[in-house]
Amino acid sequence: MKFSRDTIAVLKNFTSIYSGIMLKPGNTILTRSVTGASYGEAEINDTIDFEAAIYDLNGFLSILGLVTDQAEVSLAEDASNIIIKDQRSTIHWPAADPSTIVFPAKKIPFPVAKVIFDLKGSDLQQLLRVAGGLSLDTFAITNKDGKIVIHGYNQLEDKELARPLYSLVCGDYEGDAAFKFIINKLNMKMIPADYRVMLWAKDDKFATKFEGTQASYVIAMEQGSSHEFQD
C-alpha cells in the first residue's frame, strides 16, 4: 500500500493522542490515549492491507518522509518488519509487539446526543490560539440565555471556574435542560477543521464527540461537569 498525504496528516495528528498505532486491514485508523480520556477515529482513502503495531509512530513517519510519495509499505513475510520501498531504497522498520502499545479494539459507538451544534474550523483555531495567549487550560460547553457557549478558563487560578476569560457563542439552544461539559484543553487534539459537536450525558457519565469529515474524536469530560437531562 501507499500512504497518501491525507493519511499521513491523520497519523501525525494521532501521535498527539498516543505515540503508537495499531494498523489493521481496511480503511479505518483508531487511536486512544493511555488514560482513555481521548479517542480518535478516521476513515482514510488508502486501504491498509496488513496488520502491524508501530511503537514509535513519529519515528516511523519521519522515516516515511525520507522516501518518495510512491513508496510501497508492506509487512515482511515473518511479520517482524514493516518494509518501506521506493524505486531505489528499501527500509525495514521493526514491527512492535501489540501488547506494548494501547489501542482501541474496535470503533466506539456514540450514544444518541442530547445536544448537537456545529463548530467552525476558524472558531476552533481561534479558541486554541486564545487559549495559548491567555493560558487557558479548561473549556466548558454550556447553555446561557438560549445560546450554546464555550467558555475558557485558567483553572489554576480559578478552581471554581467562576471567571471565564474567553467566551464563544456557537449557536442557538432550544432545550430547557441546563448543562456544563468541562473539557481539559490537553485533550483537544483535533485536526483544525469544521466539526459537528455532540454532547451526551446520563447520570454521572459524560462524553463529547467532535465529528469531522477527515477524523472524529470522543473526549471524556472532567470532574465538575453537570447536566439536567432527563432519560
Enumerate the language-model features and the residues they cover.
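DNA polymerase processivity clamps
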Residues: 1-94, 113-231
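Long, charge-dense
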Residues: 98-117
